[in-house]
Amino acid sequence: MKKLLTIFFAFCVASAIFAIGDQQRGGGNASSGLITVGVINNPPSESGYRTANDKDFKAVFTAANGYDASFAYSIVFEEQLVAFNQFVTNGVDYILLSAAATDGWDDAFRAAQRAGVKVFLFDRMVSAPSSLYEAAVVSDMAQEGKTAVNWLKDQRLGEYNVIHLQGVMGSDAQIGRTAALDAEFNSGAMKKVVQQTGNWSADEAKAIVQSVINAGTPFNVIYAENDDMAKGAVAALDAAGVTHGVGKDVVIMGFDCNKWALRELFAKNWNYDGQCSPFQASVVDGMIKGIQNGKAPAQKKIISEEKGFDARTITQADIDQYGLGE
């Protein structure tokens, strides 16, 4: 299955690259007067968060708003790197990147800089020096993890036997959301029942939780690094007749705040959901327009304001205001 997904994402990247065509560098598309932009993102099918994120960028980076934008998608670093290098070769004015992995971008960023292509980060940070990109409009993934784990500690459970479902390994979201929980495992305050990547997938998460249930290993917390994996975990619990949510056998924690996930909190089927804002496009747009007018970004790093939601206090107004999708 993983091989098929890799092939599919490779096809998506290749299709996007071939669709880009020849573009000219230096203040916009010479024939149309539009600013040329290459957007590299995870595929919308990855999660409800990513669907909202992709929709946000496609709504902002339009011809009507002064852009000739091309999009490439993959959750695989090597495939994103191919797309990045092709955008540089094609001479776009800007590359906007939500990186699949934090490491390995330095040389590509330097090549873009030499070619006069400006790079913006969105959603996720990378480990490259900040001098190699214009600015980053991102979530503080480490703080998301700390907020979630602090909430969990405040529940004062008699014991913490945790199934930890990680996102794609090496991504900023995975690293940040894992770090705070790892600190608790390392201190002995919480017990690691299993810690395994579910690759943001409900199906993979369901299989992991099912294997723990089949083994008869006791657990009372599922910490899933996105909503889709939490949903898959809950499906495994339901199939086995294990109760979950407020006052039940297993505490359920997710991230992203899809509307359907917040409704699960409201119904007290889940316990916690951490917000991760997908709306960075308008901020990046404003920075690009400033650069086009000779004004450098005022800030190198802009962090989205985010919070966590508790099933005992969430309201319908919270769902309406903060929930993603329908």
Feature annotation, model-predicted:
Residues 34-56, 60-82, 86, 98-103, ...:
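Extracytoplasmic "Venus flytrap"
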Residues 48-63, 67, 144-148, 172-190, ...:
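Short, solvent-exposed amphipathic alpha-helices that sit
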